[in-house]
Amino acid sequence: MKTNALFWIILCANAGMYLLDTVANRLNLRALKPELPGEFEGVYDREEYRRFLEYTAATANFERVGATWDLAVLLGFWLLGGYDLLDRVVRSAHMGFIATGLLYLGGLYFGRWVLGLPLEIYETFRIEERFGFNKTTPGTFAGDQVKSLLLSAVLGGAVLALVLAILQHGGPAAWLYAWGMASVLLIVMVYLAPALILPLFNKMTPLEDGELRREIMACAERLGFPLAEISVMDGSRRSTKANAFFTGIGGTKRVVLFDTLVKNHTTEELVAVLAHEIGHFKLRHIVQHIVGAILNIGIFLFLAQWLIRWPGLYAAFGVRQPSIYAGLAVFLVLYGPLSRVLGIVRGAQSRRHEFAADRFAAEATGLPHALGEALKKLSRNNLGNLSPHRLHVVLYHSHPPVLERVRALEGKG
């Protein structure tokens, strides 16, 4: 395959990203502290802390293997002419432009899924199983994979078909039309996800009447939060790990509590967690997140429309017959490093939002200690990293390290 300047730029950018990931991974392992921080005395015992250190090392090593595998697959497919070979195969079916594009992009997606499946199986049934987290049966795992593939085929295929048609026929402003369409679909999906998507994978039940529901509803009322529903999700079907999150907008918005969270925390702690989630809404973090996602879509489509019409992009990947669908596929490889930069910005914003929601919850409930205790228990039960390296936090973390959050709540941060 012939090379050009863009070939070397893209190759070096992706190799550089891999090296940065490797350095961050190693630094994160070196940052592990053999002694338990004082704030967590009485939360972890010695055996639990040893287990945390082993789990962090195991997951870090697995991440390094996964990153190496991903890079090897990309380089092998790219340098052996895979993008052009697949293009010639789908063109030989003599279908229309949209169908050919969907077959090409769908083939890439399916191939990536197949090659990533062994790693996902190993992570679920070896690493998570070894440390007592996994509750997923092979049947549940297989069902989740099939559902995910079908959702990707139906929803992803429909969106891709529209994007391909718009970019093909929309002229110079096509990216704007595609951006508008994708933005509307994003908002619709955020609205419909609680009713249509989440129930496909998990059973959602209303929180039963009792002290916890009364306290949560009273807290929501005090904070002026029109809570449509408090749902308990059967997260224990798949893992012992716990979480809570806010989902939906408008009339579909709800707070979702994992059943493992409800089981392991006091009423005060759960009310504080709920207040934290309400804080994201009251402080308009949800709106900012949606706006940020829409801006990212716009940046992607603007750059994509500009670059997929450049012959040098196709030459860099050995694609002999330019097309919009092949252009989008190879542009994704170029966009990866840029996406990492945008991800760093989004991560910094997200961590600020978490601190702000913590402050909101502490002030609104007068229970900073309860939220701090909830964070400590979550970290212990999930074996979360108490002291990740700063570079690792900057590159990957949407939440601040739990130790920093606890210290901020205790007035020590």
Label for each model-derived stretch:
Residues T3-P322, G336-G413:
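Polar-ligand-bearing catalytic/cofactor-coordination segments
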Residues S323-G327:
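Glycine-rich, flexible loop segments associated with nucleotide phosphate handling
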Residues V330-L334:
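Alpha-helical transmembrane segments
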